[in-house]
A protein has these predicted regions:
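Extended, charged catalytic domains and RNA/DNA-binding interfaces, predominantly
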Residues: 1-176, 187-202
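Outer-membrane beta-barrel pore domains
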Residues: 178-184
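Conserved small/polar residues in nucleotide/adenosyl-binding loops
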Residues: 206-207
Length: 207
């Protein structure tokens, strides 16, 4: 609640526009404003009956990550280990599938970053929305489970979804180390790879 209050105060002061739809985002861009979207990463706050999803949606929630690299009642995340593959653990639970379907009905975007591969494919199977991973890189370059395989990237492209480049060093460096001295060329290597598969309209910079 405190974060929502802060964001609304920043909006009141003219620093950004809180957006609830694509048209809101377009209008914000036209006015030269930052377009802000309410997002939660890891759905631990959501109860099995999805009542809190309704409450948060009423408060402005428009994007959700079902997991944050650890299990929830909805699915399983990927470990922070290197080298590693996203192909670990089981897929979405029945509650996870229900969450996906209700998010579709409420026009809440589902963020696939942090979700394991089985969960990714379950979302692809049960969601009628474009696939989105807001902060993930190319697994073919950096063998970290937080990154996306070529097959996953192609599925996102086929759905007209999008991928945001992640600036975290361990997901960029080919040795998987969390060191700050990542050259710009390494970021561009991942970005070029995403552009090759997704095209420029579906590749983003995540900050």
């Amino acid at each position: 609640a405190s974060q929502v209050t802060i964001l609304r105060e920043v909006e009141r002061l003219g620093g950004l526009t809180i957006c609830h739809s694509v048209s809101d985002i377009r209008n914000a861009f036209e006015k030269g404003k930052i377009a802000a979207i309410f997002h939660i990463e890891g759905a631990e706050a959501i109860d099995p009956d999805l009542h809190m999803l309704e409450v948060l949606h009423s408060a402005g929630l428009r994007s959700i990550g079902p997991v944050w690299s650890r299990p929830t009642i909805f699915g399983e995340g990927v470990p922070f280990s290197f080298p590693s593959t996203p192909d670990i653990g089981s897929g979405l639970t029945e509650l996870g599938i229900a969450l996906v379907k209700r998010c579709n009905e409420l026009n809440i975007m589902i963020d696939l970053s942090h979700l394991n591969e089985a969960g990714f494919w379950d979302v692809a199977r049960h969601s009628n929305a474009p696939l989105v991973a807001t902060h993930s890189n190319a697994h073919s370059i950096t063998l970290h489970s937080r990154n996306l395989t070529d097959k996953q990237l192609r599925a996102i492209a086929d759905s007209d979804g999008m991928v945001g480049l992640n600036f975290a060093a361990a997901f960029l460096r080919e040795d998987g180390k969390m060191l700050a001295d990542v050259p710009l060329s390494q970021m561009l290597k991942h970005l070029d790879y995403l552009l090759e598969i997704l095209g420029e309209d579906l590749s983003l910079i995540h900050i």
